[in-house]
């Protein structure tokens, strides 16, 4: 009788522990997994300026092509004039396989042309998602612009690719309308170093 009671008690404890673990696991996943995109407003139009080669500090180099692993400046404009945007709705920019966002989890303000903040933008490796806040309800002239640093991660044979502009495929030229080139190795004069080893 005592053994039977002990068995039932252990079974109850095991079930309780399993339930606690499931709740904890669910909470952990909710914390570490990227939050599901807010309700996407596909009426927001996104367009791009030409991609520009840059360096790690963001200095731009117009007229030069990008090599593998080079930083590239992506400038975009968004227009929600006919989208009736609501708080909690979002738009996104998805990158093609040739690029990745340089900073994962980067947060930037989403602002109108007059500087009013109407949301926040956050990056993953492949996607920039901008979500409107409550200020969008009272805003007018619902247009703005932004920019992000991306990185060339694939050598190409063509000079353009397709970005996902909030659900619409949009062709964009690589920097200087050229293909992405292999890493440019720089040869250095090792003569002086070699001579120093002989001494």
Predicted regions and their residues:
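Bacterial N-terminal signal peptides
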Residues: 16-28
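Extracellular/luminal low-complexity Ser/Thr/Pro-rich, glycosylation-prone repeat/linker regions
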Residues: 31, 37, 166-194
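N-terminal secretory signal peptides that target proteins for export/translocation
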Residues: 1-10
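Short beta-strand elements of extracellular/lumenal beta-sandwich folds
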Residues: 68-83, 195-199
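Low-complexity, intrinsically disordered segments enriched in Ser/Thr together with acidic residues
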Residues: 131-177
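A surface/secretory-pathway sequence property marking extracellular, secreted
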Residues: 40-57, 97-135
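C-terminal region of N-terminal signal peptides and the immediate post-cleavage residues
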Residues: 26-43
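Surface-exposed beta-strand/loop patches in extracellular or lumenal glycoproteins
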Residues: 77-100
């Amino acid at each position: 009788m005592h053994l039977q009671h002990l068995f039932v008690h252990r079974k109850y404890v095991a079930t309780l522990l399993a339930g606690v673990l499931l709740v904890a696991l669910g909470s952990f996943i909710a914390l570490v997994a990227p939050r599901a995109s807010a309700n996407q407003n596909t009426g927001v139009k996104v367009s791009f300026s030409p991609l520009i080669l840059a360096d790690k500090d963001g200095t731009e180099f117009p007229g030069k092509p990008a090599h593998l692993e080079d930083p590239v400046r992506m400038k975009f404009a968004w227009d929600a004039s006919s989208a009736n945007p609501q708080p909690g709705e979002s738009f996104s920019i998805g990158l093609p396989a040739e690029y990745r966002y340089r900073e994962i989890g980067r947060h930037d303000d989403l602002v109108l042309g007059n500087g009013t903040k109407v949301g926040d933008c956050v990056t993953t490796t492949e996607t920039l998602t901008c979500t409107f806040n409550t200020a969008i309800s009272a805003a007018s002239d619902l247009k703005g612009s932004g920019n992000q640093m991306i990185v060339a991660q694939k050598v190409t044979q063509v000079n353009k690719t397709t970005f996902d502009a909030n659900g619409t495929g949009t062709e964009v030229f690589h920097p200087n309308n050229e293909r992405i080139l292999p890493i440019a190795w720089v040869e250095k004069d090792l003569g002086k170093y070699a001579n120093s080893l002989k001494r």
